[in-house]
Amino acid sequence: MAPKAEKKPAAKKPAEEEPAAEKAEKAPAGKKPKAEKRLPAGKGEKGSGEGKKAGRKKGKKSVETYKIYIFKVLKQVHPDIGISSKAMSIMNSFINDIFEKLAGESAKLARYNKKPTITSREIQTSVRLVLPGELAKHAVSEGTKAVTKFTSA
C-alpha cells in the first residue's frame, strides 16, 4: 500500500511541474497568465473562446494622427504633389513633437504665474520661446487669426 501511495504523488508531481513550467514560459508573454487562469473556470477550449469574445468587446484602440490634415494642407499648397507613407509618418511625428514642446512650455508658464489654466496668452508666449525668429512671428500671426475666426464664428 505504501509503495502505491508513493507512486501516485510521484506521478502527480511531474504533471504539476509541467503546468508550472508552462506558466513560467507564458508569464513574460503579457496576457497569457490571464488566459491560463480562465481555462480551469471555463473548462478547456471554451475558456479560450471566451478570451476571444473579451477581445471583441474591447475593440481596436483608435490612434489619432494628423495625417488627414497634413494631406489637406499639402493639397492647398501643392495640389499636384503626393506624399509617401514614410514621409507622412515623419510629418506626423514632427507635429506631435512640436505639440509636446509647446504644451510643456505652456504648462511651465502657467505654473510660474500660479494660474490653473493654459490660455491663448501662454500658448503665444510658448510659441515665441520654442520657435526661432521669423517662424515664431508667422506662427503667432496665424494663431491669432485662427483664434479670432473661431471666436467670431
Swiss-Prot record:
PROSITE patterns: HISTONE_H2B (PS00357). The keyword Cytoplasm does not apply. Residues 1-60 are annotated as: Disordered. One of its GO terms (molecular function) is DNA binding. Residues 1-28, 36-53 have a biased composition (Basic and acidic residues). SUPFAM superfamilies: Histone-fold. It holds the Pfam family Histone. GO terms for cellular component: nucleosome; nucleus. It comes from the Eukaryota. CDD domains: HFD_H2B. Belongs to the histone H2B family. Core component of nucleosome. Nucleosomes wrap and compact DNA into chromatin, limiting DNA accessibility to the cellular machineries which require DNA as a template. Histones thereby play a central role in transcription regulation, DNA repair, DNA replication and chromosomal stability. DNA accessibility is regulated via a complex set of post-translational modifications of histones, also called histone code, and nucleosome remodeling. This is Histone H2B.7. It comes from Oryza sativa subsp. indica (Rice). The gene is H2B.7.
